[in-house]
């Protein structure tokens, strides 16, 4: 069953608590390879142990918030505002879970669109936005670094499509 936590604010204590011990779309790349095979490496094992520890203790250790993360939090607001003005009305949601497989996977989309769409925003450093605009946009491809997260988000929400928004202040937005 899909559960929407619409009032939850991403990054809040409530949001961290809801994600505690759950596999989420943003972390799926740690257990699935870009070729969609199950990972079997130190990162995968470390992540599974981290989730296990969270389930046992009901505690999520604090994470370092660096300059890139701070920029991302600010850029996400700007990107969503620009997206809404350019493309479509958006509805914000904090967290979505789906447990139809006998276990729960979580996803924090940046916005939902109507009944069938969602938006995932990425704040990019200028050099990566330049790469996105020159390598991926002309051929209508998604940066491989984000494919697993977008696909998992669609799996969790059971929606039909996702606009991946790549944003860097001062440069064109890519969708």
What role is predicted for each listed range?
Residues 1-74, 78, 137-140:
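Charged, glycine-rich intrinsically disordered N-terminal tails and low-complexity linkers that flank
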Residues 50, 78-81, 148-151:
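Short, contiguous clusters of charged residues that form electrostatic/catalytic patches at enzyme active sites
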Residues 63, 67-95, 104:
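Short, well-structured hydrophobic secondary-structure segments
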Residues 86-109, 113-175:
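Nucleic-acid nuclease catalytic cores
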């Amino acid at each position: 069953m899909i559960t929407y936590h619409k009032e939850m604010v991403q990054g809040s204590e409530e949001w961290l608590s809801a994600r505690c011990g759950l596999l989420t779309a943003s972390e799926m790349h740690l257990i699935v390879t870009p070729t969609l095979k199950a990972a079997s490496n130190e990162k995968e094992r470390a992540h599974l142990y981290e989730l296990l520890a969270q389930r046992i203790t009901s505690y999520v250790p604090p994470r370092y918030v660096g300059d890139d993360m701070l920029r991302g939090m600010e850029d996400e607001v700007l990107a969503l505002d620009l997206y809404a003005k350019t493309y479509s009305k958006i509805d914000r949601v904090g967290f979505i879970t789906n447990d139809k497989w006998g276990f729960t996977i979580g996803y924090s989309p940046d916005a939902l669109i109507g009944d069938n769409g969602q938006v995932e925003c990425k704040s990019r450093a200028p050099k990566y936005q330049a790469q996105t605009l020159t390598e991926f946009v002309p051929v209508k491809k998604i940066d491989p670094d984000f494919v697993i997260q977008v696909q998992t988000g669609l799996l969790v929400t059971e929606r039909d499509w996702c606009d991946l928004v790549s944003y860097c202040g001062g440069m064109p937005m890519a969708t």
